[in-house]
Design a protein with these regions (language model features):
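Intrinsically disordered, low-complexity basic segments at termini and long loops, enriched
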Residues: 1-24
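Extended ligand-binding groove/face enriched in aromatic
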Residues: 120-157, 200-208
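Amphipathic alpha-helical repeat scaffolds of TPR domains
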Residues: 148-167, 225-243, 298-305
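Positions within ordered alpha-helical repeat solenoids
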Residues: 112, 160, 200-203, 240, ...
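Eukaryotic intrinsically disordered, low-complexity segments enriched for acidic and Ser/Thr/Pro residues
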Residues: 22-140, 170, 220, 248-255, ...
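Short coil/linker segments at helix-helix boundaries
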Residues: 133, 140, 160-193, 197-220, ...
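Acidic, Ser/Thr-rich intrinsically disordered and amphipathic helical segments
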Residues: 79, 98, 105, 154, ...
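Long, amphipathic alpha-helical regulatory blocks in the mid-to-C-terminal portion
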Residues: 198-200, 204-205, 258-278, 329, ...
Length: 441
């Protein structure tokens, strides 16, 4: 069994990280959840990359909204928000179904705070923290910021679910990883759903947040970052489709080339979106390395399949252009392996999955075809050196689109006629009550 230099480097890198983790364990440095439970130190494997999940942190909704809206509405807001925070913190975000349901219910009641007629948009200071280290990132008094954070969390949960599907816990008898066709299609559906959440954030929520508030928000919520993740999700969906096409005997060479070229377009767009963002804190640099890695893989795939199409021609120029494509694909594949290592070692450290799908096929085929075709047409390359230029890749309309997302209907509690019956307290009196409470404290 041949072991490439790429795998040796990866092994050394991961061994170094493992030793580092072991030393940390032998000392006193241990990460703990807020409830005091020890957090397992492990290096996660990543197929579908999602920036670190942000979850709600404790904030006093009761005090901020007391007397302004009915008590049952305040209680429902507080109860749902606390439930989301506790479940996410306790499970590390793995209770996806429960969290998704709670987030949908919370959105339904939260929407009322964004309505201008209620005058409550800037009264509550909403706090969010990083799930991994528990560090509080942002504290913003704006209901639209809270809505953005909730929908963003739904998108991250959906990406995590897709990642889980693509990392099976069992292996086939042959020792190779097997992901069923149904699981791959489910993962594509989830990626389109996540892209829809993020597109909604960019188009319908960010525009409602004042510029001065945007400056104080987490860098993960920049419009360029959100757009990049949305487009990246479409790219990963296309990569899965390319893998399915490679496995299918009915898929033509033209179909495979089209999918490979679309894959490249998605990652080109994602790179353009994120390149103009401030990536200094958090997961920014790791996110950039992920996009670079997948961009280089996509470009290698596009040139490989374009070369196969050109090689079908009968003219010498067709074969020369094809060989140029194959050699370019081989070089890009080498660069993609380097980018993969940089992605894995960027903080927080992760593991690359074993080669799967389209890229497993291409890592085997590209070096083989490049070597064979360059030997076969070496005499043409020597005779026609002036024609040794890389041909342009064809442009295609993109096939995948984000799923449409709409907010749930506003909770009926906001439309009830009980507000007057419960004696809605004037804002002025409410503020006076708050001052009295502060003095008492």
């Amino acid at each position: 069994m041949k072991i490439s230099a790429f795998h040796i480097i990866l092994g050394i890198s991961f061994l170094s990280v493992s030793l580092f983790v072991y030393r940390k364990k032998m000392g006193c440095t241990y990460s703990v959840y807020g409830i005091g439970r020890k957090k397992k130190l492990s290096i996660p494997e990543v197929v579908v990359f999602a920036p670190c999940m942000r979850i709600p942190a404790q904030c006093d909704l009761q005090r901020a909204l007391k007397g302004l809206i009915p008590r049952d509405v305040i209680d429902k807001l507080s109860c749902l928000r606390n439930r989301i925070a506790l479940v996410a913190d306790d499970t590390g975000g793995s209770a996806i179904t429960e969290l998704r349901q709670a987030l949908e219910e919370y959105l339904s009641i939260l929407i009322g705070l964004t309505k201008k007629e209620h005058g409550l948009e800037n009264l509550v200071e909403f706090k969010w923290k990083n799930l991994v280290d528990g560090r509080q990132e942002t504290s913003v008094a704006n209901a639209w910021f809270e809505l953005l954070s909730v929908v963003h969390m739904m998108a991250m949960l959906t990406l995590c679910e897709a990642d889980t599907i693509m990392i099976p816990k069992d292996y086939s008898g042959s020792g190779f990883r097997v992901v069923s066709t149904d699981c791959k299609r489910d993962a594509v559906d989830l990626l389109l759903k996540a892209a829809g959440y993020l597109e909604f954030c960019v188009r319908n929520v960010l525009c409602c947040i004042p510029p001065e508030i945007k400056k104080s928000m987490s860098k993960d919520l920049q419009d360029g970052v959100l757009e990049a993740i949305s487009i990246q999700a479409l790219g990963q969906g296309t990569e899965i489709q390319l893998g399915l096409a490679i496995e299918s005997q009915k898929a033509t060479l033209s179909v495979k080339r089209r999918l490979a070229c679309e894959l490249l377009i998605y990652y080109s767009q994602a790179y353009q979106c994120i390149s103009g963002c401030d990536l200094s804190p958090g997961y920014g640099k790791k996110h950039m390395w992920f996009i670079k890695w997948k961009f280089l893989e996509a470009k290698a795939a596009a040139y490989y399949y374009h070369g196969l199409v050109l090689d079908k021609g009968s003219e010498p120029t067709c074969h020369i252009s094809a060989v140029c494509c194959f050699l370019a694909a081989q070089e890009l594949l080498v660069e993609s392996k380097k980018a993969c290592i940089s992605f894995c070692l960027a903080t927080p450290v992760t593991r690359a999955p074993p080669l799967w799908g389209a890229m497993k096929h291409l890592h085997q085929k590209i070096p083989e075809v490049a070597s064979r075709k360059s030997q076969m047409y070496g005499y043409l390359l020597e005779q026609e050196k002036a024609l040794q230029s890389l041909p342009e890749l064809p442009d295609f309309q993109l096939s995948l689109r984000p799923d449409d997302y709409e907010l749930p209907a506003i909770d009926p509690a906001w439309d009830s006629g009980n507000w007057e019956k419960q004696g809605k307290q004037p804002l002025k009196d409410h503020l006076n009550d708050s001052e009295d409470e502060i003095e008492t404290e």
